[in-house]
Amino acid sequence: LTLLDTPGHVDFSAEMERVLQVLDYAVLLISGADGVQGHTQTLWSLLQQYEIPTFLFINKMDQPGADREALMAELKSRLSEGCIDFTHAQRMAAGGTAQDTTKKRIDADESDPQRKDTEAVELWYEELAACQEEALETYLETGSIPKEQIQDMIADRLVFPCYFGSALKMQGIEEFLNGFVDWTEPVQYPVEFSAKVYK
């Protein structure tokens, strides 16, 4: 795994765009305090232009006014409906099928934390299923979506995993790194030598 840190400031957009051309995946950092800004949308357009699968990390969630639900709504409306909260995706994916979780939710008392967990699993799968017709068919037939299919949806820029945290306080970093490893696929390149030269 090789990470390339690009300048985020608008003055270095040209240098950043050159780096985009060699990426397999991108991580777009967004301030939880400021939300989606004009430059964020510019970067998003470039990522779309170069067809780069993208993860989002919403930073500074420790600051006053950082509202997770409001930020998710903004990401969906200003960037893509495919922006989905993956913070607890590993646990979600291990939570069983929708039929399993529906039964647990019906059996559980309304005040039971397990009921909220099972509802979250259902909602997560429903959001994923809404991003692709094949995923919807799989979800309706089996009550879940295989990890490999979710990875393909991310690679095809149909789904954009979102993680939340605070780099300053080291919150959410481990969850993001684990998720990045879990939900990415190795890219196969031809054995012949090739390079891109630019000035």
Predicted regions and their residues:
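Structural and coupling elements of P-loop NTPases
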Residues: 1-199
